[in-house]
Amino acid sequence: MSTQDLEASMRKSVEATQRNFNTIRTGRANSSLLDRISVEYYGAETPLKSLATLSTPDSQTIQIQPFDISALASIEKAIAMSELGFTPNNDGKIIRINVPPLTEERRKEFCKLASKYAEEGKVALRNLRRDAIDKVKKQEKDGDFSEDQSRDEQDAVQKTLDKFIAELEKHLADKEADILKV
């Protein structure tokens, strides 16, 4: 595995972790909070983004305007059943969600969730490192690399991992600061 391939794979892991971070509530409304909601639509689970336009008219409100009015009740039910704890308000054309301010206890829960997502991201990065080092060792065993070249490659893999873990830690610190900001 080349260094560019390894970096690309690690970049994807960091981006996946960032997408997970985006689903965690902060003190203000954000349409990405609803990214993981699937709606039963004509018998199939469909992502909410595919069924409606999501917007945030102000810092405390998320507005959902379905493309098909017949999906309104299903969307409302999916939001109410989600673990987000939102109560949707349906006016017959648009669903509005008032995002209440977070309690201190809820903020701490979300910080723990962010830490869990970051740890999952680190595990994915470490797995990529392990795979890359295994390939380098195999190449050394096959005679493609000398012992010194193998050690240099392994050091390069470790430095790449360290860089991406530091980036992940920075994203986690930013997200925690965002969650804890009142």
Curated annotation (Swiss-Prot):
GO cellular component terms, A-Z:
cytoplasm
- Cross-referenced SUPFAM superfamilies: Ribosome recycling factor, RRF
What are the UniProt keywords, alphabetically?
Answer: Cytoplasm, Protein biosynthesis
Where does it reside? Answer: Cytoplasm
Name the cystine pairs.
none
Q: Name one Pfam family in it.
A: RRF
Name-wise, this protein is Ribosome-recycling factor
